[in-house]
């Protein structure tokens, strides 16, 4: 097992095979932050849709971003982004990051999060776990491809279909 701590940090690099958590709970109930950008500018958003798995021989994360989300422009402009996971004490911070736009306010400051940069990509010191992700593929959800048509009606009344991003998890950081 690989474990190397980052200098000046409580975060250690872990082998992804050593992870032991339920992704359905971690993403769907506890939520995650999708963050992209660098020191010159970044943004973050809360997400409760996503997935983890293996594709093309790589450990991957899948995330979904609607076109109107400010974070999307940062994800689109960069090759990498981070997914970060938090304990219950940070639920309010994730609520702020999910309900306010970085276009209109400094929601990172308002949420009490402290940015740092790993491999040139923004993440937050308060996270218990961070995945550094390198984009491999993206596509738009298309209405004509719904087999279960009720999902189109239920989740897309405004027809603001998500972009799907599949990204290789290149680094896993875990709070020690």
Where are the regions that the model predicts?
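Single conserved hydrophobic/aromatic residue that forms the stacking wall/gate
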Residues: 1-13
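Active-site-proximal mixed secondary-structure blocks
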Residues: 14-47, 51-176
